[in-house]
Amino acid sequence: MSEDSPPPDSPQPPTIAVDAMGGDHAPAEIVAGAIAAAADHGMSIVLTGRPSQLRPLLAADRGGGDIRVAPADELVAMDEGALASWRRPRSSVAVACQLVRRGQAAAVVSAGSTAGIVATARLRLRSLPGLLRPGLAVALPTGPKPTLLVDAGAIADPKPEMMVQFAHLGVAYAQVAYGVEDPRVGLLTIGAEPAKGNKLARRAHELLAAAPHGGQPIRFTGNIEGSDLLAGKVDVVVTDGFTGNVALKTIEGAGGFATELTRAALQGSQAARFGTLFQRRALRELAGRMDSETYGGAALLGLEGTVVIAHGDSKAKGIASACRLAADLARGHITERIRERLGPSHRAGHFLRRQ
């Protein structure tokens, strides 16, 4: 691939580098999702992976979309962690990141191992100057403008200062993706009072309340509890990656549980079936909003490039949604927005030395 990807604000669609070998259903469903994204959203796609496996799948494409293949001989398996990213410089996700670094693609999409993607992206794309750690942001289904959860699993045990930066990442995302002019930021903990929570949460609350730290202001509204995650009270929820990932998986499980309850009710008594039929549409919409195939995945923010991590069991619909999200973030100059939000104090390293 010789030509560079157009700038994000170009009338041409951005080029998305898709890791075709990452995910439980790779490469068939990944390729199908890429074909759908190219056909439905007019974007250019570069699939990274083994040409011998990808070209036969592309041969069935009758849509005529702009899809190319960049050879990658290695892959990071779903059960492998961060070390695999060092051992396999020619993995499909590493090649995708290199395309972005060289300006030949605007964003990366992968459904591979989260730990492997985060490690590879940090190694190949590098963090923005002054950023302590990148954060994983995912949209929660709270209505027309979702609530963003940051961090959803990139850093399990962050420092409090990192959580202030997570707030900046989430604010930039909300502004770019959902047009929220002045996003409200809440800290996820076990009570609304500032003194509630563990040592990490209490210190993070102090720092968020005192922000900005050389960057742009944060509209911090205080603590929120788990019961408020889907209430739409804030636009950005800040937490550590361990808590955030548990919360996200719980919400996903609740969506599946609602679907199973509906199925069970439809097989119950006549009265139960009659009542459920009236609620079926609403329940279907609720389950759809909580479906990982719909929201497109999580954005790994704070790097010199856009990375979207799709759910590991994503099929074609989920991959197409992830490609659309990646294109939207690239068009909205998400990297530059974050760079502006961090401000000179972060870039100068005054906020906290990198750990």
Language-model region placement:
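Glycine-rich phosphate/diphosphate-binding loop of Rossmann-like nucleotide-binding domains
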Residues: A28-E29, S44-V46, P51-S52, A156-G226, ...
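Glycine/threonine-rich beta-strand-loop-alpha-helix active-site module
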Residues: A106, G112-M162, F166-A167, A172
